[in-house]
Amino acid sequence: MSTAPSLSALRSSKHSGGGGGGGGGGGADPAWTSALSGNSSGPGPGSSPAGSTKPFVHAVPPSDPLRQANRLPIKVLKMLTARTGHILHPEYLQPLPSTPVSPIELDAKKSPLALLAQTCSQIGKPDPSPSSKLSSVASNGGGAGGAGGGAAGDKDTKSGPLKLSDIGVEDKSSFKPYSKPGSDKKEPGGGGGGGGGGGGGGGGVSSEKSGFRVPSATCQPFTPRTGSPSSSASACSPGGMLSSAGGAPEGKDDKKDTDVGGGGKGTGGASAEGGPTGLAHGRISCGGGINVDVNQHPDGGPGGKALGSDCGGSSGSSSGSGPSAPTSSSVLGSGLVAPVSPYKPGQTVFPLPPAGMTYPGSLAGAYAGYPPQFLPHGVALDPTKPGSLVGAQLAAAAAGSLGCSKPAGSSPLAGASPPSVMTASLCRDPYCLSYHCASHLAGAAAASASCAHDPAAAAAALKSGYPLVYPTHPLHGVHSSLTAAAAAGATPPSLAGHPLYPYGFMLPNDPLPHICNWVSANGPCDKRFATSEELLSHLRTHTAFPGTDKLLSGYPSSSSLASAAAAAMACHMHIPTSGAPGSPGTLALRSPHHALGLSSRYHPYSKSPLPTPGAPVPVPAATGPYYSPYALYGQRLTTASALGYQ
């Protein structure tokens, strides 16, 4: 051939996507198959294709100076055909042939529109025979080293266009809506060939490109990674998943044979030799057809992340050179859920809690199913490691009762979690933005129900791994004084009746089944009583005071109303009725808001007298454990804090 290998490599990367330019021999095979059939004897991808099978590809590449000497200059030709060359091709004026040797398939490497036209023309076609699939896959994988060809492999992996071998005789990019999962199987020899790119580093371009192929149900599709040099290529077989993320242009040729005999067992090696800039896409496959596509950014060093998943439930191999912690992605095999795919209807967005979890409420189960890319650095989900979240959960659940005897901060759903499941039972303080745990679930005295972002209560694992959404406010030390104020937890702190039903919910074995459902401007009352008579007497405290005094029922500002409003006051302040009504124990949490009373509150429509202009705002320094900041901001903020948000 008259062309030098460098020029042919340039032509191959620019027009045919690398390795698509024929192979000088193998007349029985189509041209694009013979390009990857192990023909390393010729000058590489630039050897001329047969003119009979490719009527629109010339024998001499357009960048050849011998051909361009009789025509326009190369710069003018490139300028004319830069963006409009694929529009003027006559393929678009011809009907779509039904044979795989179609001009549309030849042109689909240049234009996404032609790829779409080819995909649409092949909807509903029967699958080709397994023998042709096997031969094509084996020829793709086997000859990738010979035909990848140095510079062509480099440029092809950087620009990442679609190869002709990806669209070949076996309808690679066709959408097969009627195919069954078993009809797409590949033999183990062919699956092993799908792993590596070319020997010169055609990294990641192999028998299937997971971005462009829309496969059947065994191998789930994901978005194309066209920008990265090492776009992953995975060949799937029903028994195991071969997952080999192709390297950067100088990467190695990593292949793992699939383990077909292993039943539902995914292969442990998703080996990735990621380049300095490339993503390493590892795919973890479980026997149930669930793939987790883990996009790891290898921070520092050319070695990517190697993720292994053994879906039997034992710990998978996990090794990487990046600074992120070992992500034991197979701690709970039943919790692994792929990212939401538009082609697969039966997927759940959030992982379901696995059946083997023993933590009450399955917080660890609902969170441990997350693929490792959701976790920040330094957080693992392995229950055997001391710094992991699940280990902290299980240890805290085993140490105390089922209720809130553990710190609320050790819940992974407390601070910054992707699915906010425990969004109810919030503290109604305007400055308190944390989750409480529902002490009524266990029926026990939850003495340590401090706020989740109390610095003393947050677990070390949570602090290291999870940045809390809201910074700690100085008022938060107050909620831990609940333990001193409550007389050993005579009544559970009335947060909400149930974590998901804040307006009172009767649990079957609750020791205090009667709940006050009075809803005022302060929110629901939710105080619990053992008998209906106590509930009735408590309801009278809500309704006993006529006129303006009704506003005072929960806010003990004068000593004359303190005894009558003791139950309602303890209801609105989240503390039990222990101690005298005016004692510091009873007023520990909320009295700085309410002891200001009606006199210093702003009521736009009431005729009640406002305080005298020269009188200072009354601040109860003796009753509360801290100085109230609400008195400093004027009447409107005091109104908002006392009326609306507690």
Swiss-Prot record:
Disulfide bonds: none
Major subcellular location class: nucleus
Keyword Transcription regulation attributed: yes
UniProt keyword list: Acetylation, Metal-binding, Methylation, Nucleus, Phosphoprotein, Repressor, Transcription, Transcription regulation, Zinc, Zinc-finger
Modification Omega-N-methylarginine, positions: R636
GO biological process: G1 to G0 transition involved in cell differentiation; negative regulation of cell population proliferation; negative regulation of DNA-templated transcription; negative regulation of gene expression; neural precursor cell proliferation
Zinc finger residue ranges, C2H2-type: 514-542
Bias type Basic and acidic residues, positions: 250-259
A cellular-component GO term for this protein: nucleus
Bias (Low complexity): 34-52, 130-139, 227-240, 316-330
Ranges of Polar residues composition bias in the record: 1-11, 217-226
Stored InterPro entries: Elbow/Noc_ZnFinger, Tscrpt_rep_NocA-like, Znf_C2H2_type
Region of interest called Disordered, as start-end residue ranges on this chain: 1-70, 121-332
Gly residues compositional bias, start-end: 16-28, 140-152, 189-205, 260-277, 300-315
PROSITE patterns per UniProt: ZINC_FINGER_C2H2_2
Signal peptide span: none
Residue positions, PTM Phosphoserine: S102, S231, S237
Location(s), subcellular: Nucleus
Residues found modified as N6-acetyllysine: K209
Annotated GO MF terms: zinc ion binding
UniProt keyword Repressor, yes or no: yes
Family indicated by similarity: Belongs to the Elbow/Noc family.
Functional note: May function as a transcriptional repressor.
Protein name, entry field: Zinc finger protein 503
Organism: Homo sapiens
